[in-house]
């Protein structure tokens, strides 16, 4: 139960930080335009109607399609979140859900996701992203690492028989 509370806090915190960071970036951009923060990082303004890296943004009705897809993914993740028995996985899913909700809120309010962080080195420019994208990416990576670690130690011989395996919960 405690992990569920921490997971819900993660959802709310990530969502709130994402929305605040976007509001700040929108305000900053409207006053100052694109701004180099570090030699490799700039504040920019990109309205992304597609998915990762702007893919499929030119599709007719892309916002409607991706809004429904986002809702479906968030609902699926929330079901997994509620059913999860692993504290660490619950927190990872909370971070992912919070980020996904942040981007969904943009789609519903603006018709596109607001991206404002641009990483670059010389002529190389990584596609713009936002705080929610970072949280979704980090949450998924942490969740996958936990799954790999869990499955690596999940099968334990309890009887001395190499064919007799049982699942060990951590």
Swiss-Prot record:
Record gene name: lspA
One Pfam family per UniProt: Peptidase_A8
Catalytic activity: Release of signal peptides from bacterial membrane prolipoproteins. Hydrolyzes -Xaa-Yaa-Zaa-|-(S,diacylglyceryl)Cys-, in which Xaa is hydrophobic (preferably Leu), and Yaa (Ala or Ser) and Zaa (Gly or Ala) have small, neutral side chains
Classification via HAMAP family: LspA
Residue ranges crossing the lipid bilayer per the database entry: 5-25, 62-82, 89-111, 126-146
Localization, UniProt: Cell inner membrane
Key words of the record: Aspartyl protease, Cell inner membrane, Cell membrane, Hydrolase, Membrane, Protease, Transmembrane, Transmembrane helix
UniProt source species: Anaplasma marginale (strain Florida)
Record function comment: This protein specifically catalyzes the removal of signal peptides from prolipoproteins.
InterPro entries recorded: Peptidase_A8
Known EC number: 3.4.23.36
GO terms, biological process: proteolysis
tRNA-binding among keywords: no
Family under the similarity heading: Belongs to the peptidase A8 family.
Bilayer topology: Multi-pass membrane protein
Source organism superkingdom: Bacteria
Catalytic residue list: 115, 133
PANTHER family, alphabetized: LIPOPROTEIN SIGNAL PEPTIDASE
GO-annotated cellular components: plasma membrane
GO molecular function: aspartic-type endopeptidase activity
Protein's UniProt name: Lipoprotein signal peptidase
Pathway: Protein modification; lipoprotein biosynthesis (signal peptide cleavage)
């Amino acid at each position: 139960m405690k992990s569920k509370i921490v997971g819900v806090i993660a959802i709310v915190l990530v969502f709130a930080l994402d929305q605040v960071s976007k509001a700040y970036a929108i305000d900053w951009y409207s006053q100052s335009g694109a701004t180099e923060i570090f030699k490799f990082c700039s504040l920019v303004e990109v309205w992304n109607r597609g998915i990762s890296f702007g893919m499929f943004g030119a599709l007719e009705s892309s916002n409607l399609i991706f809004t429904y897809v986002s809702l479906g993914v968030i609902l699926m993740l929330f079901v997994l979140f509620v059913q999860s028995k692993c504290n660490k996985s619950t927190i990872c899913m909370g971070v992912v859900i919070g980020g996904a909700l942040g981007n969904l809120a943009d789609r519903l309010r603006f018709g596109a996701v607001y991206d404002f962080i641009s990483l670059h080195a010389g002529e190389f420019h990584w596609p713009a992203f936002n705080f929610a994208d970072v949280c979704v990416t980090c949450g998924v990576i942490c969740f996958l690492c936990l799954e790999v670690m869990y499955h690596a130690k999940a099968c334990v011989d309890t009887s001395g028989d190499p064919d007799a395996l049982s699942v060990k919960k951590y």
